[in-house]
């Protein structure tokens, strides 16, 4: 982990960075001009856990959504972005975090028509309507 932090510091050298803390980041120190639980920029709020009471544009990451779809008879499980109106949930990009199925009750806010999933493939991102995800 120390080597990862050094590598990240080198990558970010000379760049302005903003870091929003999450529950997996309690003992991590990252080079950043801002570090906190929430950050707003140009009317968009970035936070770790979505706030269902805030109806403004928001990007959050806590749930690490995944979707399971059938393709040519095979069940495929992929991390995904979830988008509905003015909200985006980010997928997990690390190997140490799992994923929450988009059909889980915790994500009921995103379980209706109009929600789009963006599944991460090895070389591309695939957009599908949420109703294509297996229940």
Annotate each predicted stretch with a short phrase.
Residues 1-135:
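Extended recognition/assembly regions associated with phosphoester-bond processing machinery
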């Amino acid at each position: 982990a120390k080597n990862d932090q050094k590598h990240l510091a080198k990558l970010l050298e000379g760049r302005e960075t903003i870091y929003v803390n999450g529950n997996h980041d309690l003992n991590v120190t990252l080079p950043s001009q801002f570090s906190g639980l929430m950050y707003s920029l140009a009317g968009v709020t970035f936070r770790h856990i979505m706030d269902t009471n805030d109806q403004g544009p928001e990007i959050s990451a806590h749930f690490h959504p995944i979707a399971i779809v059938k393709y040519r008879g095979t069940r495929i499980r992929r991390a995904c972005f979830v988008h509905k109106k003015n909200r985006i949930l980010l997928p997990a990009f690390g190997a140490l975090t799992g994923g929450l199925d988009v059909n889980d009750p915790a994500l009921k806010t995103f379980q209706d028509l109009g929600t789009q999933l963006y599944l991460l493939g090895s070389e591309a991102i695939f957009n599908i309507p949420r109703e294509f995800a297996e229940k």
